[in-house]
UniProtKB/Swiss-Prot annotation:
GO molecular function, one term: pyridoxal phosphate binding
Protein name in the entry: Alanine racemase
Positions of modified residues (N6-(pyridoxal phosphate)lysine): K44
Cell inner membrane keyword on record: no
Binding residues annotated for substrate, in chain numbering: R139, M317
HAMAP family (UniProt xref): Ala_racemase
Family: Belongs to the alanine racemase family.
Pathway(s) per entry: Amino-acid biosynthesis; D-alanine biosynthesis; D-alanine from L-alanine: step 1/1
GO CC field: cytosol
EC number from the UniProt entry: 5.1.1.1
Amino acid sequence: MPRPIFALISPTALRHNLSVVRQHLNRAAVAAGGVPPSIWAVIKANAYGHGIERALRAFSEAQGLAMLDIEEAVRCREAGWAGPILLLEGFFTPQDIDLLDRYHISTAVHCQEQLDMLARARPSHRINAMVKLNSGMNRLGFSPQAYGAAFEAAQALMRDGVLGSVGKMTHFATADGPQGPQWQWEVFQAATQGLPGPVSVCNSAATLRYPELAAGPGATHWVRPGICLYGASPFSDTPAAAFGLRPAMTLRAEIIGVQQVSPGQTVGYGATFAASKAMRVGVVSCGYADGYPRHCATGTPVTVNGVATRLLGRVSMDMMMVDLDPVPAAGVGAPVVLWGEGGPDVDAVAAAGGTIGYELLTALAARVPVRDAS
């Protein structure tokens, strides 16, 4: 028998979350007197660990897909996706431009080197592009001072038949926090004033909390929701459920051993947990080699037999220990939910480990089998 651990992915939850985002944007558009933006469903990092092909089927109602890897983009085309695809980091070599041309893939353009490669290209089809502004995150994009010239260079490539539509995009650094995105939005507006083409500025956090930035009248807007489509929250202060989102990934395991621990005895590496009373301790078939955060400490939530309990001591490579006192009927073979449907929120587990839900979902180990939920 295989080791008792697996991840369940719910296509129903994926579809539901896309619908929630769409309805949220529709309401914002009505309030602003504008048109609802189009949605690029972000499926980078193997669809945040959920599987590219699975996400393709679930997000069939999205207007487009956004990702990083050109090979994943080609897989989407070969799997039958006919809508727009955007490469968020753009391309890296002249040979990549051949693939953009052959598979009708759109690209971000964020540096002069990419413009230079495009200027030397002779594609058989026009390539759509989004010229990226560095509005303050200082990651990718042209500076506000250089943006006008970069956009004009892209328009020249459009006139030369290399590029098709040319749009404007940026990425918000603080849409998930109290500072908000307004400071970057003002930089973006100033740098792009009077420039034509579609606009894309909203990530998951901005889509959920500041949808008016993409729902007002004027240019065609595209939003780029990612983590929220998978049922996790981009915010540390607001759970995904507050937006009506459902977890798409559930990590399940089992109790594979039970220990009777006496008062004063310790549990796990480093003896970091000492029992204050006699207690039952369950050994779970999941560890940090499966993608569970090693830094999660005693008290991290976990569910056994449908009952909330807690992690005890340090997480091992292949196992972890949990408190079975709240679950007196649980023994070997009892089902365990580490995160997801019927268990703790992935963001709560991540917070206990000093990280974010994004990391847990994308770091699920290859040795963990992944199944579709029925």
